[in-house]
């Protein structure tokens, strides 16, 4: 008997309060690594009405004007009018940054393996910046090997921001959220149940002053300018039963940091797989590559995507775990949920052979320290909104499938 169910994922725009914080945090990462690629950074940001607080720990040779950096990013996002409750030029920016704890630094600078004379391998030099568990996922639901619900939700959010920025829908304001419920039948996406868009907007639109008229105009415009263009090249289309909800509270004029406080690292499911895969709990933004919450999660995605791209599984989840100050992973797990084409133990052996999963190895393989300088001073801030994975609009090293053929070759050698 077939099983029919719904799965829902959400996304938020770059103007969402939490995403403002993520982007400022990662702009700090970009700037510090651009000037000093050995920078150690844990940058947290809080925003509220008229206020930005930058706090955390930074050890770097770079000299950065954090106040100016934050204002520029806020303006780029679109908060330039104080009448909207938050503006780049008028908000207060407070900076309270300390140096990285020497107790933590010693374990990162010289890993347990070298301190105990267990190894002289260069890649054993850097210890994990913290303990923790990280997950990565890939599946064959979309060309970018991402789950369809989060893929569509991000596309709607990016399109929503685009029509605001181009002026096509000039009455839109920066804050917004999207949500998509996909119909599955026996694990395969077959339809769209609900599309939800909540978007901040002007009080009136042209000559339309009553709220009912404003909401009707927004709903019609979003269907034509956001939903239809996104779905144009998607195989699954809305049906007559598909619900399209816009601003279900009835109004969304007060938004951004005036409507809700924002904090770095509060959109970890939006950043990853939309709840479709497990999550270790660690956020990405504001962390330099020695923090395995970030770098190892990227490595997990890299491994999982190459396994699926190689045709070795239809779905794959990879888990890594680390101990603070220790270079080598505590554990590595490869799970294919019954869709694997080869023995999972042999697949795990191939992963261990082909992928370097020590922090220094991940940093080196994915070039995580040099990316900001190679990309003109901005890299991490661009993945801080609209997802860190499955980004066809960005050239992300962990999205490469260069190991797929090598995985198949390695498994052929052992007779799989």
UniProtKB/Swiss-Prot annotation:
Pathway: Amino-acid biosynthesis; S-adenosyl-L-methionine biosynthesis; S-adenosyl-L-methionine from L-methionine: step 1/1. ATP binds at residues 16, 175-177, 251-252, 260, 266-267, 283, 287. Its cofactor is Mg(2+); K(+). GO terms for cellular component: cytoplasm. Binds 2 divalent ions per subunit. Binds 1 potassium ion per subunit. It is found in: Cytoplasm. It catalyses: L-methionine + ATP + H2O = S-adenosyl-L-methionine + phosphate + diphosphate. Residues 100-110 are annotated as: Flexible loop. It comes from the Bacteria. HAMAP family: S_AdoMet_synth1. NCBIfam families: metK (TIGR01034). Catalyzes the formation of S-adenosylmethionine (AdoMet) from methionine and ATP. The overall synthetic reaction is composed of two sequential steps, AdoMet formation and the subsequent tripolyphosphate hydrolysis which occurs prior to release of AdoMet from the enzyme. This is S-adenosylmethionine synthase. The lineage of its organism: Bacteria, Bacillati, Cyanobacteriota, Cyanophyceae, Oscillatoriophycideae.
